[in-house]
Amino acid sequence: TLNQNLFLLNQYPDYIFNFEGGVKYAWMKEYYPREYELMKAFVKAGRWHVSGASWDATDTLVPSVESFIRNIMLGQEFYRKELGVESTDIFLPDCFGFGWTLPTVAAHCGLIGFSSQKLDWRNNPFYGKSKHPFTIGLWKGVDGASVMLAHGYDYGRRWDNEDLSENKYLMELSKCTPLNTVYRYYGTGDVGGSPTIASVASVEKGIKGE
């Protein structure tokens, strides 16, 4: 993950990478100290984003709220001391289920965002043909606290060095939202690593309008 993304960050000036889990950063520091220092420079430059806030991704249904908050506090303390930044979001792309307390927990911890793709795994639609209420919007908790939700569909999508403005799949998805905007993860799921070079090249072309 470190080496592949450091390569992409050096090769593509518009490439930005999000990575979660304080414990994984601690492992980087312990086992790959040279690459860890290179990564820290990209954090400072705003191109490697610390996501997720917590020490590690966690289930949100079984653990107590106190456990959830302590996980976030531990992660944020590590990020402040090691990287000089704090995360602003809860990032759970591969967590099964989200408790109704999540917006309240996020707000209590000073977080403003929440992102996942897991709602797309539902067997039955949420309403109509959709498996989730919206792709980008505010999720309001029972106490009135809210968090910005960005739902990215599946997390293993790859682009084959194509013109994304002509991608029929993206165009159809964008019609399903009031803002005509679609939010997507892209990259490599489960095994770590990075997006493919072709995927990054596709996004670079889109940014440049090519």
Sequence positions of predicted segments:
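Catalytic-domain carbohydrate-binding cleft regions of carbohydrate-active enzymes
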Residues: 1-210
